[in-house]
């Protein structure tokens, strides 16, 4: 779950050709009405809507301290959770939205406190709906780029750092009461394990880490009903 099957019934768009034709006519042939400049966004459950921009300008931050969550992983050297060498850590945050849906729209961040054991290594995070296991998105980062940017920095083994991780773009609904789950590892999706292998595990400190997601509230009036096959 989490790779589009849940949106299958609303995946086919029969009006793309019309949209492309209008753009071709106006911008290449210089005739006809100017197409609307907006974004058509599909939520993870398949629902379409129109936004002026994406991420939406009216987004509001939802902040979650992972210290309020429970974690289940391998514990070594002073009780820190370790990622890498085939080990994973799962952080469960069940009681975060008991009374309302959370609609994530944008690029969430997770500022992860970590202690590398090597000048190298990486952390991969998969975020899931804690109730259903539905994949919502992922993030990955090499510890040498923990502050961002394009140039690697030397990492001192044993020194605590904050990994400024950013998820791939997400537009997803988390139903009320379902909560979030974060699975930490050193590889996932099409990201291979680091070349340094088992030598470069990363100790993570969820209790000092913070997740933040851009959220919006959208009513039924924003839903875009698209043509469907008969």
Give the ranges of each region predicted by the language model:
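Glycine/threonine-rich phosphate-binding loop and adjacent beta-strand/alpha-helix elements that clamp
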Residues: 16-18, 25-230
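Soluble non-cytosolic domains of exported or imported proteins
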Residues: 11-15
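Catalytic cores of eukaryotic secretory-pathway lumenal/extracellular enzymes that build
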Residues: 1-10
């Amino acid at each position: 779950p989490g790779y589009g099957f849940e949106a299958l019934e609303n995946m086919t768009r029969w009006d793309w050709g019309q949209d492309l034709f209008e753009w071709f006519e106006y911008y290449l042939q210089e005739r006809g009405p100017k197409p609307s400049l907006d974004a058509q966004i599909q939520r993870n459950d398949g629902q379409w809507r129109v936004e002026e921009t994406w991420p939406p300008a009216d987004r509001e931050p939802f902040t979650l301290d992972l210290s309020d969550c429970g974690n289940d992983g391998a514990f070594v050297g002073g009780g820190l959770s370790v990622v890498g060498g085939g080990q994973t850590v799962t952080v469960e945050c069940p009681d975060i939205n008991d009374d309302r849906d959370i609609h994530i729209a944008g690029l969430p961040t997770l500022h992860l406190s970590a202690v590398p054991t090597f000048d190298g290594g990486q952390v991969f995070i998969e975020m899931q709906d804690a109730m259903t296991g539905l994949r919502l998105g992922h993030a990955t980062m090499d510890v040498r780029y923990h502050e961002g940017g394009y140039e690697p920095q030397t990492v001192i083994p044993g020194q605590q750092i904050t990994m400024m991780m950013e998820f791939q773009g997400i537009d997803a609904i988390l139903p009320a009461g379902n909560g979030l789950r974060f699975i930490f590892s050193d590889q996932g999706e099409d990201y291979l394990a680091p070349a340094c292998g088992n030598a470069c595990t990363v100790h993570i400190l969820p209790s000092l880490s913070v997740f933040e997601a851009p959220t919006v509230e959208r009513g039924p009036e924003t839903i875009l009903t698209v043509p469907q096959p008969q």
